[in-house]
Amino acid sequence: MNITFEGQTVLITGAAHGFGRAMALAFVARGAHVVALDVNAEGLAETTRLCGPACEAGVVDVANRDAVQATVAAIAARRETIDILVNNAGGVRGQKGRPIEDISASDWQDIFDVNLSGSFFMAQAVAPVMKRQGRGRIVNISSGAGRTISLTGIQAYASAKAGQIGLTRQLAHELGPFGITVNCVAPGFVRSNPTTEKQWDAMGAAGQTALIGQIALRRLGTPDDIAHAVMFFASDFAGWITGEVLGVDGGK
């Protein structure tokens, strides 16, 4: 299978490290022009350095609808197309699992803002561009937490990630008549950023061994494993697939 994105424009949120950086590198290697988006300017600078001139950076908070609209409008004005959107921005916003009675309204909302609202705002902004083209690919990055439960016990994270799956299915039916596919990748636990490194360390040796023992392939995934799944959904090989959720977790 030879996957290429020659001449295509790809927007990737959460591209300052981890999955997003791996995706940026993978798309650039296959001929795409990548617009790497994140709130972390320093991390974006490293992503663009690694990717080279085919990658540009844009600092934006995906939870800010007005900022998202302005950013996408500017990209659309200077690029001929926006072919692919990967909604990768997310995470737990520094939170840890706590009893439900200890969760504030802002704790709950903060996680929904970046994980679910951010995906909605980005899709909302690119949809008119893709409709005019008559073609597009949207790939949402959910989590195994959205399919089962969160390993961290963070209620908002599991709920927001499940919401991304629902959003994927709904948008697939809404946008399908315009030649736009919408699919979802649900990664298992991957040591991909400072937050997941802290979670890994907190498990201790026994917890780490137990986690790997629950995985059929008996290893943790890598950011490249997730990027490769995104490559498939974004490619012509997935042209008749939409509204689907692909678990990339080594077999759970």
Task: Please identify what each model-predicted range represents.
Residues 120-123, 135, 219-248:
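C-terminal substrate-recognition "lid" of short-chain dehydrogenase/reductases
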Residues 128, 147, 173-174, 239:
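Alpha-helical segment proximal to the catalytic Tyr-Lys
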Residues 96-100, 104-112, 211:
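Substrate-binding pocket helix/loop in short-chain dehydrogenase/reductase
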Residues 123, 160, 168:
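Active-site helix of classical SDR
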Residues 177, 184, 189-215:
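A glycine/serine/threonine-rich, flexible loop-to-helix segment
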Residues 176, 181, 241-243:
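Short, small/polar-rich loop/turn modules that mediate ligand/substrate recognition or access, typified
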Residues 143:
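Residue(s) in the substrate-gating loop at a strand-loop-helix junction
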